[in-house]
Design a protein with these regions (language model features):
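Catalytic-site microenvironment of enzymes
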Residues: 1-245
């Protein structure tokens, strides 16, 4: 009864698994995990405890055992677009333009690595957040990188951040480790790094695969605003993202 990866979300995949279990266990198949279903699940768990092949939620400590990126499916999600400008710098630079430039270059580098790459937008288009998740899910993506910029009331605020899925005590171990890896690459490339954080954002929750939202720059910081307009900066950031994957 394959319910997919542990994400702390009762979605269609989990509901189908619940229905299959109920039908095979001789229960009323309604997809509702009530008292009778929980009792039967607990009985099965006790019966299976200690047997070979017991489910482990996170193999290899959260790492994906691969020598290269070749063959992986990656979705790049440049945040905002169209009438949704996102953050706007003091000089009028829109977040939507920065994320698109970074996303397009990251996609080029990933294709050169042999990845199958899809972008949620390749032009100045406004794409709803759930449509972004559906695009990634439809492509059966292995990795989803959502690109944004940060902002703060203080122009001194600076440093990259990454967000992985977390709700209550459920979190994505793969996402957390990817955030750490990308952060290390950004620091090695000379960019300040604040850290990684678990969040229950819609895209992180709804998209399958290993999902991460990255905000490498503060557009409200004058130095970052200047960097965001330099092609060599976009190149370094894109290479840090690809290296982190």
């Amino acid at each position: 009864f394959n319910a997919g990866p542990e994400r702390g979300v009762y979605d269609e995949e989990v509901e189908r698994a619940a229905l299959d279990f109920q039908q095979n266990a001789g229960l009323h198949a309604d997809g509702i995990v009530g008292e009778s279903t929980l009792k039967k699940l607990e009985a099965v768990r006790k019966a299976e405890s200690g047997r070979e092949g017991k489910k482990i939620p996170d193999r290899d400590g959260g790492y994906v055992p691969a020598r290269s990126l070749a063959g992986n499916s990656v979705t790049i999600d440049p945040g905002h677009g169209g009438t949704d400008l996102g953050v706007t710098s003091a000089g009028g630079l829109a977040e939507k333009d920065v994320t698109l430039a970074l996303g397009l270059r990251t996609a080029e580098l990933l294709r050169a690595e042999g990845c199958r790459v899809r972008l949620t937008r390749e032009g100045d288009d406004r794409v709803p957040v759930y449509a972004r998740a559906e695009a990634a899910n439809g492509a059966a993506t292995d990795f989803l990188l959502s690109l944004h910029c940060n902002a703060d009331a203080s122009p001194a605020a600076r440093g990259g951040t990454a967000y992985y899925f977390q709700r209550s005590h459920y979190y994505s171990e793969h996402g957390r480790r990817l955030a750490c890896s990308i952060g290390a690459r950004m620091e090695a490339a000379g960019f300040p790094w604040i850290g990684r954080f678990g969040r229950n954002y819609a895209l992180l929750r709804e998209a399958r695969g290993i999902v991460l939202m990255v905000e490498p720059l503060f557009l409200t910081n004058p130095d970052d605003e200047d960097l965001a307009q330099q092609p060599e900066c976009m190149e370094k950031l894109a290479r840090a993202l690809v290296g982190g994957l």
